[in-house]
A protein has these predicted regions:
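Single, function-defining residue in the core of a domain
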Residues: 1-102, 110-117, 122-278
Length: 278
């Protein structure tokens, strides 16, 4: 499909209040897709096209939410034919420290850096083909909350950034076609018990890298102990690069899995029980 036709199919129906604005969006997306390594002035064919793009961006009717909604709709349509859909959740920090005059930025992990935090859910086929975004949310941290980490156990998940994982999972259930099985993957920051306890369709599963060695249900076992005791199900060779005086080598990664019911953390014992996870 030509880039121009693809762009129209992807975002041509964006709800920007005017068909001409949607057409300009499709043109801009097509231009940027053709030259993803450059900015708008270089991607646009002429000075007039650059000026038109600038006017379009300055229009109050053009909102990130409307653009994203059109793309998410297209992603959901592409996902409908998948036997299993992978939904990859991740967090990115956009560092704008080099632009101190920029308004609206907030602190990042390093106190000297400022910018935005972006939470995305990327749909990927079982063959590893990216299908598009299912959800995205960006925000600037409030400087007044910097250094409040010591109070995290006294605050509910909804009052912490950890809520982003639950919101992403809820968005997946909202937009993915109902019959499509989904496996959501995320890194250690997503090891939040409320995420496992949150209601989700029975054919939506979670694959989360463990960060906390919590006790399993009413048992005395802990998940890392249980995993080590499970039989090896697969062996994958992994190339390990050189480190210091250590030469490069090939390691063998042994994959083990087991089913277990996770208990809730002690500070929230009365919430819904966690579903079994594997």
């Amino acid at each position: 499909m030509p880039a121009a036709a693809w762009a129209v199919a992807e975002v041509g129906a964006a709800g920007l209040g005017d068909a001409r604005r949607a057409a300009r969006l499709a043109t801009l997306v097509s231009d940027l897709a053709a030259r993803p390594d450059v900015g708008i002035p270089a991607a646009c064919a002429t000075p007039a096209a650059t000026k038109a793009a600038d006017r379009w961006l300055a229009n109050d009717a053009v909102t990130p939410e409307a653009i994203l909604a059109a793309h998410i709709t297209a992603t959901a349509e592409r996902s409908g034919g998948e036997a299993v859909l992978l939904a990859v959740q991740g967090t990115t920090a956009l560092d704008f420290s080099a632009q101190p005059a920029l308004a609206g930025a907030g602190p990042l992990a390093h106190p000297a850096h400022s910018g935005l935090v972006v939470q995305s859910v990327l749909a990927v086929s079982a063959d590893g083909v990216p299908l598009g975004l299912l959800h995205q949310h960006s925000w600037a941290r409030d400087p007044a909350t910097t250094g409040a980490r010591h109070t995290r156990r006294q605050r509910p998940t909804a009052a912490k950034e950890s809520q982003r994982w639950l919101d992403g999972q809820a968005a997946i259930a909202d937009v993915v076609p109902a019959a499509v099985p989904v496996l959501t993957g995320a890194d250690r920051e997503a090891d939040v018990c409320d995420l496992f306890a949150q209601s989700r369709p029975s054919h939506h599963e979670l694959l989360i890298r463990a960060a906390h060695n919590r006790r399993i249900g009413e048992e005395t076992r802990q998940p890392w102990t249980a995993a080590r005791a499970a039989p090896g199900g697969a062996v994958v060779p992994v190339a390990v690069g050189r480190g210091g005086a250590r030469p490069p080598r090939e390691a063998l990664l042994v994959l083990r899995w087991t089913a277990a019911a996770r208990g809730r953390r002690a500070i929230a014992p009365h919430g819904p029980p966690c579903r079994p996870c594997r």
